[in-house]
């Protein structure tokens, strides 16, 4: 009898909650109710709210009023249409409701609350991916593309594709990011020099605009929305499906890390390699810095060589690591040794410091996962990450190196995290898309991927970032920030430069009430 009574009470409480309108906040701080008639799967429990309030950056904490866990794209569209001009249902009122903010959230890997919606509604895109029919990843019959739910992680796209012997051609270093999240920024990594960023490898999108309109777009169908959304920081619509280009998947990878003590040789070899388009060229290229005032990670190298690698870093204070990979399978096996031999003979690295591993294709692409596991075990993953990612014009990279790397980083008492340093080709980017790059044929991707672990204050690392930006400003180095977070309109206008007027026009066209992605702080 007691158990029956308890079950009845739980049923009644659940029914009561489901029949209670959800209270959120409008732009003006006014209470707005989401009416039951919208039939939305809305979560307001403390765990859901807390999970949506912070991100990988672990610097901001902005509570939404509610989290939408949609089972269909029509739920998202209903939410946005209501936000544009529904009714408040507050004390029987039938006057138009005040607008409220809406943000799509994938894996929450933003750095400064870009996927937050303070007081508004965060749309959990993972829910949408889990409900996708017939599946979150559908490979075409001919294997040339995949239709992917935007909340799907790239690692799941990879798994589904390689099962069919195909693969996307360009990747981020970390695969546990949502497809919609990277396409809203650019999606860059070691294949970008050859295939462009991930946004350059999309055939078609399904998007729900800020007005709640469900639209399919491509270079020929609704092209303004297509090009605007790709790299558009979530300002024009929520991507719900992406058609991703696929190619033949290799099975194995020759993965090399090659050490340089001379920056000029490092720079020369990197730029030569990204210019090679024949079969002897590499499929992946990145660069990293190993500095004596930071943690020197020697885990990639054979145990017998780790001591001399560490000694090389200590002797020179800084070592430049060229990281390249060449893919192969049974059909291309004969050329692999030729490529490795050419690299060993023609590159200007420190003699005896070229190291090669032979690994499965999946393991190579998923390589950062092992680093994540290590950091999690040490309690150093869920810490503040005041990262700085910038694109530096190739013509000024020597000045940047001398002023920032030698002048700032090497003079720090200690450095934390990874420093990325590698060039890419601008002609692999589509200028019609919203993403901004320096106006030069070759520009460098610089990533100061710092972590504030232990007693370190993230503000100290942020101050270093500010010094880097200030040095570039004072030196006339026209950088473009990536994954940036500006809080002043003039900074956004400067960032977009000649694209600003078009960006603003598209905002008015697709999200006139400025509801979407308020955490970017572009139109707030």
From Swiss-Prot:
GO terms for cellular component: extracellular region. Pfam families: Cytokin-bind (PF09265), FAD_binding_4 (PF01565). InterPro entries: Cytok_DH_C_sf, Cytokinin_DH_FAD/cytokin-bd, FAD-bd_PCMH, FAD-bd_PCMH-like_sf, FAD-bd_PCMH_sub1, FAD-bd_PCMH_sub2, FAD-linked_Oxase-like_C, FAD-linked_Oxidoreductases_BP. Residues 1-26 form the signal peptide. Residues 60-249 form the FAD-binding PCMH-type domain. Its main location: secreted. It is an enzyme of class 1 (oxidoreductase). Glycans are attached at residues 39, 58, 124, 411. Keywords: FAD, Flavoprotein, Glycoprotein, Oxidoreductase, Secreted, Signal. Coiled coil: none annotated. The modification Pros-8alpha-FAD histidine is found at residue 109. Its EC number is 1.5.99.12. It catalyses: N(6)-dimethylallyladenine + A + H2O = 3-methyl-2-butenal + adenine + AH2. Its cofactor is FAD. FAD binds at residues 104, 106, 108, 110, 114, 173, 178, 184, 188, 239, 482, 517, 520. Transmembrane segments: none annotated. One of its GO terms (biological process) is cytokinin catabolic process. Catalyzes the oxidation of cytokinins, a family of N(6)-substituted adenine derivatives that are plant hormones, where the substituent is an isopentenyl group. Belongs to the oxygen-dependent FAD-linked oxidoreductase family. This is Cytokinin dehydrogenase 4. It comes from Arabidopsis thaliana.
């Amino acid at each position: 009898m007691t158990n029956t009574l308890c079950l009845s009470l739980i049923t009644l409480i659940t029914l009561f909650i489901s029949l209670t309108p959800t209270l959120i906040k409008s732009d003006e701080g006014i209470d707005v109710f989401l009416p039951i008639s919208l039939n939305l799967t809305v979560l307001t429990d403390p765990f859901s709210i807390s999970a949506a309030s912070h991100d990988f950056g672990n610097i901001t904490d902005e509570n939404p009023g509610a989290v939408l866990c949609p089972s269909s794209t029509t739920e998202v569209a209903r939410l946005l249409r209501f936000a544009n001009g529904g009714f408040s249902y507050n004390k029987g009122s039938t006057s138009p409701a005040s607008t409220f903010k809406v943000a799509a959230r994938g894996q929450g890997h933003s750095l400064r609350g870009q996927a937050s919606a303070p007081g508004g509604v965060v749309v959990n895109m993972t829910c949408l991916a889990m409900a996708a029919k017939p599946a979150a990843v559908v490979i075409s019959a001919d294997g040339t593309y995949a239709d992917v739910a935007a909340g799907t992680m790239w690692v799941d796209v990879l798994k589904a594709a390689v099962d069919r012997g195909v693969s996307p051609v360009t990747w981020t270093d970390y695969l546990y990011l949502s497809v919609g999240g990277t396409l809203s920024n650019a999606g860059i990594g070691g294949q970008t020099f050859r295939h462009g960023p991930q946004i350059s490898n999309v055939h078609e999108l399904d998007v729900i605009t800020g007005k709640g309109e469900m639209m399919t777009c491509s270079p020929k169908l609704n092209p303004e929305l297509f090009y605007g959304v790709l790299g558009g920081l979530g300002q024009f619509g929520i991507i719900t499906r992406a058609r991703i280009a696929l190619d033949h998947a290799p099975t194995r990878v020759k993965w090399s890390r090659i050490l340089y003590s001379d920056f000029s040789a490092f720079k020369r070899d990197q730029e030569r390699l990204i210019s090679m388009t024949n079969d002897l060229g590499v499929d992946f290229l990145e660069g990293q810095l190993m500095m004596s005032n930071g943690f020197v990670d020697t885990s990639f190298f054979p145990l017998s060589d780790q001591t001399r690698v560490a000694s090389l870093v200590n002797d020179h204070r800084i070592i430049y690591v060229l990281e390249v990979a060449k893919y192969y399978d049974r059909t291309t096996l004969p050329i692999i040794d030729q490529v490795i031999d050419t690299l060993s003979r023609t590159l200007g690295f420190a003699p005896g410091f070229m190291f090669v591993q032979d690994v499965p294709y999946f393991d190579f692409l998923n390589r950062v996962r092992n680093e994540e596991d290590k950091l999690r075990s040490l309690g150093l993953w869920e810490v503040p990450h005041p990262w700085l990612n910038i694109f530096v014009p190739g013509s000024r990279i020597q000045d940047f190196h001398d002023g920032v790397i030698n002048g700032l980083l090497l003079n720090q008492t200690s450095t934390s995290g990874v420093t990325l340093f590698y060039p890419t080709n601008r002609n692999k980017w589509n200028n019609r898309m919203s993403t901004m790059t320096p106006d030069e044929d070759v520009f460098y991707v610089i990533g100061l991927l710092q972590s504030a672990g232990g007693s370190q204050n993230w503000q100290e690392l942020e101050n270093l970032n500010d010094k880097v930006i200030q040095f570039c400003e004072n030196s006339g180095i026209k950088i473009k920030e990536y994954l940036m977070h500006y809080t002043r309109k003039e900074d956004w206008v400067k960032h977009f430069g000649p694209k600003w007027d078009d960006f603003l026009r598209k905002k008015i066209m697709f999200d006139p009430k400025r509801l979407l992605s308020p955490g970017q702080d572009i139109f707030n």
